[in-house]
A protein has these predicted regions:
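Mid-to-C-terminal alpha-helical segments outside catalytic/metal-binding sites
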Residues: 2-10, 17-52, 216-221, 234-266
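Conserved, mostly hydrophobic/aromatic
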Residues: 8, 45, 72, 100, ...
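N-terminal/domain-start segments enriched in small and hydrophobic, helix-friendly residues
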Residues: 46, 50-51, 124-147, 190-193, ...
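Short, well-structured secondary-structure segments
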Residues: 49-64, 71, 77-85, 109
Length: 266
């Protein structure tokens, strides 16, 4: 049986989910497939045959660090892999990165739109350097965001700048490299040793384009991700299986690459 690891999901404490999901639905004019609760994600995983999910939290203000870290500790298990978050404007951001590693987590999630930064600005580089030094994986929202004005704060050129400046950083460019900037992903990123997750992208791309993009990229640097609850995990698996990839490549994307990456961050 193929190991499946969803490297890009979201969930919230129950009381937060009840507020957050309707607000996010309104901002992005999208409908969630789940209610944002952890129990619903696990039920979805069971239905889709997904063994593990990475939960990507986002600290939208410095004061959220402690509560996100605490909740992440509470929910982690052999199937749930939380990636906590810190806010770059926190006065002790460097110490918070160290605390995430000290608590035993494998990675961190950041989001330029929700956290008010440009991907390659100078103030971010010491933070990325610390993340790299701690051996943490950095899952970064890249490309535009459906809920925000289309400002170019996380485009492929900026991704490449970060990778060049911090060469040891385990950086995952989400949404197939950069959401809704896929022509630039093709031009600038494909073929380079940069991790791409496939979240919230396959249903928006023509099948042949998605297949060609996957085949143009190093097969060890592709990760399955759904962006649940904003897509159905089962539907994204079906979309991937419909691309006609080899069984060996599909196994790497579904879980083999993720398992190797996570093992290296333990």
């Amino acid at each position: 049986m193929t190991l499946i690891i969803d490297f890009h999901t979201h969930a919230f404490p129950d009381q937060v989910a009840d507020r957050a999901i309707p607000a996010l639905e309104g901002a992005g004019q999208v409908t969630a497939h789940l209610d944002g609760r952890l129990s619903s994600l696990i039920a979805s995983m069971n239905t889709a045959g997904i063994e593990k999910s990475v939960i990507c939290s986002i600290a939208t203000s410095p004061k959220q660090f402690a509560s996100i870290l605490s909740w992440s500790k509470d929910i982690r298990s052999n199937r749930i892999i939380p990636f906590p978050s810190f806010h770059p404007e926190a006065s002790d951001a460097i110490a918070q990165i160290a605390a995430i590693r000290e608590a035993g987590f494998a990675g961190i999630k950041m989001h330029p739109y929700y956290q008010n930064f440009v991907l390659d600005e100078e103030r971010m580089l010491p933070l990325y350097k610390k993340i790299a030094e701690e051996g943490l994986i950095l899952v970064m929202h890249t490309g535009f965001d459906i809920g925000f004005p289309r400002e170019r704060i996380a485009d492929p050129e900026k991704i490449l700048t970060v990778m060049e400046r911090i060469p040891g950083l385990k950086f995952i460019a989400t949404h197939f490299g950069a959401w809704d900037l896929w022509n630039e992903v093709e031009e600038l990123m494909l073929g380079k040793p940069i991790y791409l997750d496939l979240s919230y992208a396959l249903h928006l791309l023509p099948k042949e384009k998605a297949r060609a993009m996957i085949l143009a990229h190093p097969e060890e640097y592709l990760l399955f991700g759904s962006d649940s609850p904003w897509t159905s995990q089962q539907e994204v698996l079906t979309q991937l299986s419909g691309l006609g990839l080899s069984a060996e490549l599909e196994e790497k994307i579904l879980g083999g690459n993720a398992a190797r990456l996570l093992a290296g961050a333990e």
